[in-house]
């Protein structure tokens, strides 16, 4: 698949965004079965670059993501 699409996994996880060669690639949103979600850049099925993670409590964390590491994430505060 290439272009924009939606993939629903039997676990309840959902990816909606850009695909390239059947992989998550470009901008997209991955929603975990728990309700947490990541919105941002993907590169060959991996989170890579600028993005935002919303945890199960609704707290939003933004910054640079590099596969399994996300050094320097910042918590977004709304005042």
Swiss-Prot record:
Pfam families: MORN
Domain of life: Eukaryota
Biological process according to GO: cell differentiation; spermatogenesis
The keyword Nucleus belongs to this UniProt entry's keyword annotation: yes
Chief localization: cytoplasm
MORN repeats: 15-36, 38-58
SUPFAM superfamilies associated with the record: Histone H3 K4-specific methyltransferase SET7/9 N-terminal domain
GO cellular component, one term: acrosomal vesicle
InterPro entries in alphabetical order: MORN, MORN_repeat_protein
Alphabetically ordered keywords of this record: Cytoplasmic vesicle, Differentiation, Nucleus, Repeat, Spermatogenesis
Tissues with expression: Expressed strongly in testis, where it is specifically detected in haploid germ cells (at protein level). Also expressed strongly in skeletal muscle.
Keyword Repeat: yes
Subcellular location: Cytoplasmic vesicle, Secretory vesicle, Acrosome; Nucleus
PANTHER family reported for this sequence: MORN REPEAT-CONTAINING PROTEIN 2
Function: Might have a role in spermatogenesis.
Protein name (database record): MORN repeat-containing protein 2
Organism for this UniProt entry: Mus musculus
